[in-house]
Amino acid sequence: MKEVAPAANLVIPKLIVGLGNPEPKYDQTRHNIGFTGIDTIANIWQVSLSENRKFKGEFGEGRRPKAEKIYLLKPLTYMNRSGEAISAVVNWYKLPPSCVLIIYDDMDLPMGRLRLRLSGSAGGHNGMKSAIAHLGTQEFPRLRIGIGKPKNITAERGEAKTISHVLGKFSPKENKLMTQVLELVVDAVELSLKQGIEKAMSLYNNRTITENPVSKPPS
């Protein structure tokens, strides 16, 4: 039985972007979970990423899950200038913004949660502010990965604690949880490529990964 081709009106990503900061000190931090997401996807899809000066980032291309070409990008411009790299790729390949899927961290989502949307505001995220400014629209899909909020936050130390939380690294226990979350990210992206963002939204926006997952029943 042949697989049914996606309908023409479905939103299918062509460029998948992960947001983060390029210096080694930011590796594996909560704010760089977008970079980690792209690295995970590239590893599973066997796509080689290399620095591309024209695109101001690490860039790779492959064919997944069918014969269609897919582009992966990690902007190396620092977070608040991410849009420069994104627009460079979009302009070069003449891609509409609706084909750009951006993966990034979200404090308003608890750890263990994903949230796919077709469009929306930056929500205070500097990388997304830059992306929206350079693409000239909010009408492009995004995948937010929950990193949770810092505990015991106070009005006096709120901003400092927030920055420390965002730029801090996951604990060993949190890393185990995020490994499972990243597997979910790959699944959601692959479904988006096959059946569109809307289908992935319906299946993954209500999924929660817990620290002590219940064993799946036999299929």
Swiss-Prot record:
UniProt keyword Iron present: no
List of residues binding tRNA: Y26, Y78, N80, N126
Catalytic activity: an N-acyl-L-alpha-aminoacyl-tRNA + H2O = an N-acyl-L-amino acid + a tRNA + H(+)
Main EC class the enzyme belongs to: hydrolase
Gene3D superfamilies listed in its UniProt record: Peptidyl-tRNA hydrolase
GO molecular function, one term: tRNA binding
Alphabetized UniProt keyword annotations: Cytoplasm, Hydrolase, RNA-binding, tRNA-binding
Record's GO cellular component terms: cytoplasm
Recorded coiled-coil stretches: none
Residues annotated as the enzyme's active site: H31 (proton acceptor)
Subcellular location: Cytoplasm
Site (Stabilizes the basic form of H active site to accept a proton): D105
Annotated positions for site Discriminates between blocked and unblocked aminoacyl-tRNA: N21
Predominant location category: cytoplasm
Described purpose of this protein according to its UniProt entry: Hydrolyzes ribosome-free peptidyl-tRNAs (with 1 or more amino acids incorporated), which drop off the ribosome during protein synthesis, or as a result of ribosome stalling. Catalyzes the release of premature peptidyl moieties from peptidyl-tRNA molecules trapped in stalled 50S ribosomal subunits, and thus maintains levels of free tRNAs and 50S ribosomes.
UniProt family annotation: Belongs to the PTH family.
Protein's name in the database: Peptidyl-tRNA hydrolase
Organism: Trichodesmium erythraeum (strain IMS101)
Organism lineage string: Bacteria, Bacillati, Cyanobacteriota, Cyanophyceae, Oscillatoriophycideae
